[in-house]
Regions:
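Catalytic center-proximal scaffold of phosphoryl-transfer enzymes
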Residues: 1-247
Length: 247
């Protein structure tokens, strides 16, 4: 979000969901919220959460949300990395590989060994085999670096790009290892694996008027207050007349 006193600032938005309970939205600008953990804790308590109950936080990898949840609960929290963001990083590797396969004339080095590993990546991560995914990324990186020495400059650039992408993805997986799960198993159990529903909440709370593309400037405190009102309105905490005024 764009600010008029600082160039930009971060707002945390999310949803608290529990089976059999109405969804509660929460949002805040942490830099100005006096007790940010209290806002989330209130939403958890409203959902029937009690001290010691397990809590799962699904995020895009930003450490701010799981840290806030741990502060609010005062206990351990299962943090899950959103499948969509993880999948997109695999897609970037697949795109580079497809570009290499489409080259004419084809590269001197055979692409089969790397292509097999690239095609396995998504399945390995989906099935919870994160160590095997890292091994595959390591093999692709080594192969691409070696293959770059055998080809013309145009092909070399593609090979080095593939090596760089794979090295970055391996580092990303290793950094977030504690938040990676068997997504297939969780999905089959009917449990969420993505932040997509929460991202819809972001679109509801951070309306067009607060979008940086509208060139409007907000102070962190002003944005924090507006977000609190919008969350309360969307959760039905105000009467009909108040909703008309605040929408």
């Amino acid at each position: 979000m764009s600010g008029h006193q600082v160039r930009n600032f971060k707002a945390i938005c999310g949803k608290v969901e529990r089976e059999g309970h109405a969804t509660r939205r929460f949002t805040l600008v942490r830099s100005v919220a006096e007790q940010p953990h209290a806002l989330l804790r209130a939403a958890l308590l409203d959902q029937g959460w009690r001290e010691g109950d397990p809590v799962t936080a699904i995020s895009d990898g930003d450490p701010a949300l799981p840290a806030l949840v741990r502060s609010a609960t005062g206990g351990p929290v299962e943090h899950i990395l959103d499948w969509f963001h993880l999948s997109m990083r695999v897609q970037h590797v697949e795109q580079v590989m497809r570009g290499l396969c489409a080259l004419e004339p084809p590269p001197l080095a055979r692409l089969d060994p790397a292509q097999i590993d690239v095609e396995r990546l998504r399945h390995l991560l989906w099935s919870g085999h994160h160590d095997k995914a890292c091994e595959a990324l390591g093999r692709i990186t080594g192969w691409a670096k070696d293959a770059a020495m055998l080809n013309d400059p145009a092909v070399e650039a593609g090979m080095r790009r593939l090596a760089a992408r794979c090295a970055e993805r391996r580092s990303y997986i290793e950094t977030n290892e504690g938040a990676l799960i068997d997504y297939g198993e969780r999905y089959r159990a009917g449990k969420p694996i993505s932040t997509s529903r929460a991202e819809g909440t972001v679109n509801q709370l951070v309306s067009a008027r607060m979008n940086k593309r509208r060139q409007m400037r907000w102070s962190p405190r002003g944005a924090h207050r507006v977000l609190q009102v919008r969350a309360a309105v969307l959760d039905g905490q105000f009467g009909h007349q108040a909703i008309q005024l605040a929408a």
